[in-house]
């Protein structure tokens, strides 16, 4: 498998492979489980081509984003750790959908990022801002490569989430429909048809 050191990567082909992988992942019951599973599976299968080696799942909770899980080679982080929605890199991620920032970029809290086991801040927003995925970056990957990879991931995960939400809407509609329809046909009284005789 090609690595980030063997660039350039064929991103069109990589995107197709990611989409095929995502299509094989079964529905897991809720959006959080889907986001976790899809992100972990993509990183496990394509980490070398993506230049992403692990990450953290954050869920929105009021004015904060809360760590729910880690995957890949990410440093273990205690679940429940909170990062303010107003933190500049997170705000940029919410505004743009994808963000990649270096340690010296304005607004990056180097101490915070180091405590999470990362130097760069690379993340995507998914599921209508309900979740953020922050990634550990391969040190030999370039900024442009990482941004392309983040866009591929975001598109794939959002597509899966939208698909599952649409399926859920149809399931609920079928439940409502079945609840208002009678379980069996109502009884009707017998009736007779009288055919008149024609007179000439």
Pin down the residues of each PLM region.
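Acidic/proline- and glycine-rich, intrinsically disordered low-complexity segments
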Residues: 71-106
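Signal-transmission/dimerization alpha-helices at domain junctions
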Residues: 139-140, 148-167
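… and, occasionally, acidic/histidine-rich disordered N-termini of signaling adaptors
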Residues: 164-199
């Amino acid at each position: 498998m090609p690595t980030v050191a063997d660039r350039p990567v064929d991103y069109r082909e990589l995107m197709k492979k990611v989409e095929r992988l995502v299509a094989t992942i079964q529905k897991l019951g809720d959006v959080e489980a889907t986001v976790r599973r899809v992100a972990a599976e993509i990183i496990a299968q394509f980490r070398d081509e993506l230049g992403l080696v692990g990450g953290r799942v954050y869920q929105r909770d009021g004015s904060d984003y809360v760590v729910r899980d880690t995957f890949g080679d990410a440093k273990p982080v205690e679940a429940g750790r909170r990062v303010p929605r107003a933190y500049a890199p997170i705000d940029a991620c919410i505004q743009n959908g994808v963000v990649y920032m270096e340690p010296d970029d304005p607004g990056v809290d180097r101490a915070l990022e180091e405590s999470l086991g990362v130097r760069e801040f690379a993340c995507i927003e998914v599921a209508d801002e309900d979740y953020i995925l922050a990634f550990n970056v391969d040190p030999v990957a370039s900024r442009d490569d990482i941004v392309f990879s983040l866009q591929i991931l975001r598109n794939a995960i959002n597509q899966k989430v939208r698909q599952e939400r649409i399926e859920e809407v149809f399931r609920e509609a079928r439940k409502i429909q079945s609840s208002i329809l009678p379980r069996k046909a109502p009884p009707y009284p017998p009736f007779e048809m009288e055919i008149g005789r024609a007179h000439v």
